[in-house]
């Protein structure tokens, strides 16, 4: 076994986790600040991310016209939804904060649950490291976090938790979808723009799906699915 194929040591894994944590913290600051201050800062951040995602997608699909068209929809629709949601002066800020909280909690809880419990794989052909334990753990914790927003804002913890569960499921589906696309093209990461995370597509795949889920819920079930929508 040569050095290139040797499994990562504990020290290397810890170093990688530290790099991921630092990168995540650095990205979270401007993201949360832009949500708080709203347009034009949030709009600019979303557009910048969309441009980076477009560049990554075009590299990934190697200029294939059908995949380029698919990428146009995959990137532009969720980006437009995020800008539209935050543009609501009355409820935009809390809606995006809630979405971020649910998606990020799902990601973290799924990772911790999957690593600590293990068990059957969720989709071994698409993402070999993901487990059913991680999937269920992510949904469970995200549901609790989503419902907890009722403490600070008007609304039922039960309904907020329910919509949080839906968004958590959608976010993990979005993660798997992007993994499937990468596997189709035989790549591990969409780029190396974000140290420890890969590319922007790798970092926002769950958020993209979560935003679409909120839009679908809002217009299929009515504006009162959440107290602020």
Short names for language-model regions:
Residues 48-50, 212-217:
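Core hydrophobic alpha-helical membrane-spanning segments
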Residues 34-42, 154-156:
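Transmembrane helix interruption/hinge and helix-loop junction motifs
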Residues 216-229:
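Juxtamembrane boundary at the C-terminal end of a transmembrane helix
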Residues 38-40, 132, 229:
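Interfacial loop-to-helix junctions that mark the boundaries of transmembrane helices
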Residues 1-25, 54-210:
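Interhelical loop and helix-boundary elements at the membrane-water interface
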Residues 46-56:
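Central hydrophobic cores of alpha-helical transmembrane segments in multi-pass inner-membrane proteins
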Residues 18-31, 37, 46:
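The first (N-terminal) embedded transmembrane alpha-helix
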Residues 43-46, 201:
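Hydrophobic/aromatic positions within or immediately flanking transmembrane alpha-helices
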């Amino acid at each position: 076994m040569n050095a290139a194929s040797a499994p990562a040591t504990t020290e290397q894994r810890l170093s990688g986790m530290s790099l991921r944590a630092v990168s995540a913290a650095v990205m979270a600051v401007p993201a949360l600040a832009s949500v708080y201050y709203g347009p034009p800062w949030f709009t600019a951040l979303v557009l910048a991310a969309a441009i980076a995602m477009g560049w990554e997608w075009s590299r990934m699909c190697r200029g294939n016209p059908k995949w380029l068209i698919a990428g146009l929809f995959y990137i532009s629709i969720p980006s437009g939804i995020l800008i539209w949601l935050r543009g609501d002066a009355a409820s935009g800020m809390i809606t995006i904060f809630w979405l971020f909280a649910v998606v990020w909690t799902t990601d973290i809880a799924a990772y911790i649950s999957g690593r600590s419990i293990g068990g059957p794989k969720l989709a071994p052909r698409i993402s070999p490291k993901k487990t059913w334990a991680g999937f269920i753990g992510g949904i469970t914790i995200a549901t609790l976090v989503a419902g907890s927003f009722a403490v600070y804002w008007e609304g039922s913890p039960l309904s907020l938790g329910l919509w949080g569960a839906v968004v958590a499921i959608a976010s993990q589906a979005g993660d798997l979808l992007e993994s499937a696309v990468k596997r189709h093209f035989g790549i591990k990461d969409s780029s190396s723009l974000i140290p420890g995370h890969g590319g922007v597509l790798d970092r926002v795949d769950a958020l993209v799906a979560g935003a679409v889920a909120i839009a679908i819920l809002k217009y299929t079930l009515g504006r009162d699915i959440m107290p602020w929508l």
